[in-house]
Design a protein with these regions (language model features):
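Short, small-residue-biased leader/transition segments that mark boundaries at the very start
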Residues: 1-4
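S-adenosylmethionine/decaboxylated-SAM
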Residues: 7-172
Length: 172
């Protein structure tokens, strides 16, 4: 889940960037998307993807009843496969979906970001589990560890891991 502080922080990053196009991988309750939409420029849009179709009945009412519903496109589907088909260049991306596919989400985000755009990746400290050797059955922790190593060694980007709650990595 996303905390009030983290969502508020993300919204401020959007305001500072003067972002008008934002993509989110992993909607869950829609809270992050709503906070991001509040920080968008006039005419800006958040495209938020949730791969778990069973989440729709819970999430859609929160988004549709929010004061920024007109700035959010809630999409049930796989962002990794579907977002590039939009043909949109985004200012920012927020990765907070399946930890096992963070690297794929990251590569997709890079492919749809404008030059100088930002990626925010959530849960990159994963409650401290990234400091331990994961059990072979713990694919979520392994996914985050692999992502952290991948980004750390990616010379295409600048990055900083912020030790906010569960970890937030800012990538440009």
């Amino acid at each position: 889940y996303t905390t009030l502080f983290r969502s508020d922080f993300n919204g401020h990053i959007i305001e500072v960037q003067s972002a008008d196009g934002f993509i989110e991988v992993g909607t869950f309750s829609g809270y992050s998307a709503i906070c991001m939409a509040e920080g968008l420029e006039e005419g800006g849009m958040v495209y938020t993807y949730e791969i778990n179709d069973e989440q729709e009945d819970f999430t859609r009412p929160w988004i549709e009843n929010s004061p920024v519903a007109d700035k959010i496109r809630f999409i049930i589907g796989d962002a990794i496969k579907e977002a590039p088909k939009l043909g949109i260049e985004f200012d920012m991306a927020f990765i907070d979906g399946d930890k096992r596919t963070y690297i794929e989400s990251y590569e997709m985000a890079l492919s749809v970001l404008r030059p100088g755009g930002f990626i925010l990746a959530d849960n990159t400290l994963w409650d401290g589990h990234v400091l331990e050797v994961p059990k072979s059955s713990d694919r979520q922790t392994a996914g985050i560890e692999n992502f952290n190593d991948f980004v750390m060694n990616d010379s295409r980007v600048e990055k900083v891991l912020l030790p906010l709650r569960d970890g937030l990595t800012l990538i440009r």
